[in-house]
Amino acid sequence: MSLIRKRGFYKQDINKTAWELPKTYLAPAHVGSGAYGAVCSAIDKRTGEKVAIKKLSRPFQSEIFAKRAYRELLLLKHMHHENVIGLLDVYTPATSVRNFQDFYLVMPFMQTDLQKIMGMEFSEEKVQYLVYQMLKGLKYIHSAGIVHRDLKPGNLAVNEDCELKILDFGLARHTDAEMTGYVVTRWYRAPEVILSWMHYNQTVDIWSVGCIMAEMLTGKTLFKGKDYLDQLTQILKVTGVPGAEFVQKLKDKAAKSYIQSLPQSPKKDFTQLFPRASPQAVDLLDKMLELDVDKRLTAAQALAHPLFEPLRDPEEETEAQQPFDDALERENLSVDEWKQHIYKEIANFSPIARKDSRRRSGMKLQ
């Protein structure tokens, strides 16, 4: 039985995958694919702008996949900040829940990501501008009650004008390994997330910003651990082995005795670690790469750092109007129930004009 599809759609094979697109999106071209779906670029004929369209990979294969698809859709719908990727449109070619198998997320198109350009030389001015945007995006995400947990160069999208948007926020859950067998990059992850050794809060993302900023300034990954223990060893070489006050906060007994077994060592001199960085950049790194989560800067505190004085526009440092509501995710729903919720969200979606900054830095990526 052939499925009934909506009118105004056309089919196209993109990178050996069947896509269905509304006729408003022209010239689709493959951009990339990953564990959770594939992305193509297209031109929105109504605006002439290039967009990115993501087709989720088998969103209704299981309850876990369906729940993750629902979360991704809701997170994107919730975001309205120039430094956070948000939703321009969402569509399905299906005409009812009964024949609903696929849906597509339409987002702003960004030329590249930081991972792909980490080898280039960044001036401190460029690092400053990119880190300022990361922190603005994080302040907004955190104000919605979301923690990224897996911030790394690969999910920081940038365009040729050095404008940055955070991707894949709030999706780094325990389901990742279950769904893909994929082990997340630990190099940018805060020690409390890697080791689950103490409570963690939104400053896990600030640690990641510190690691990324350090790499942009030096051209080298700061903590390149081969495994979890090696990662901790690399971190402690820089932060020093903490004293009794810190050890008391550790919940994990094994971590506690391991740290206590190490000879105490002082924190490295960050001016020697980052010899080409300005004193202000060194001071910010020192405060972001703080082992104790209770002493590490928040995104709002980091934005107020003197390093960003020349750039700051508090009007752009906005917060979410309301917290992200994930109450439904605590329910154990069937695939069909998740499908109904997603279909309803798509049917009720109304695009909101994206609010991007009016100012231009005049800076080019390369």
UniProtKB/Swiss-Prot annotation:
SUPFAM superfamilies hit by this protein: Protein kinase-like (PK-like)
Molecular function as annotated in GO? ATP binding; MAP kinase activity; protein serine kinase activity; protein serine/threonine kinase activity
Per the record, the domain of life is: Eukaryota
Per its UniProt record, the required cofactor names are: Mg(2+)
Q: How is it modified after translation?
A: Dually phosphorylated on Thr-180 and Tyr-182 by MAP2K3/MKK3, MAP2K4/MKK4, MAP2K6/MKK6 and MAP2K7/MKK7, which activates the enzyme. Dephosphorylated by dual specificity phosphatase DUSP1.
Q: What is its EC number?
A: 2.7.11.24
Q: What class of enzyme is it?
A: transferase
> What Gene Ontology terms describe where this protein resides (cellular component)?
cytoplasm; nucleus
For whether the record's keyword set contains Magnesium, the answer is: no
Phosphotyrosine modified-residue sites: 182
Q: How might one describe the regulation of this protein's activity?
A: Activated by phosphorylation on threonine and tyrosine by dual specificity kinases, MAP2K3/MKK3, MAP2K6/MKK6, MAP2K4/MKK4 and MAP2K7/MKK7. Activation by ultraviolet radiation, hyperosmotic shock, anisomycin or by TNF-alpha is mediated by MAP2K3/MKK3. Inhibited by dual specificity phosphatase DUSP1.
Record PTM Phosphothreonine, positions in chain: 180
Query: Which reaction does this chain catalyze?
Result: L-seryl-[protein] + ATP = O-phospho-L-seryl-[protein] + ADP + H(+); L-threonyl-[protein] + ATP = O-phospho-L-threonyl-[protein] + ADP + H(+)
Q: How does it assemble?
A: Interacts with MAPK8IP2.
Under the heading PANTHER family, the entry gives:
MITOGEN-ACTIVATED PROTEIN KINASE
The entry assigns this protein to a family as follows: Belongs to the protein kinase superfamily. CMGC Ser/Thr protein kinase family. MAP kinase subfamily.
| The protein, known as | Mitogen-activated protein kinase 13
The species is Rattus norvegicus
Q: Which lineage?
A: Eukaryota, Metazoa, Chordata, Craniata, Vertebrata
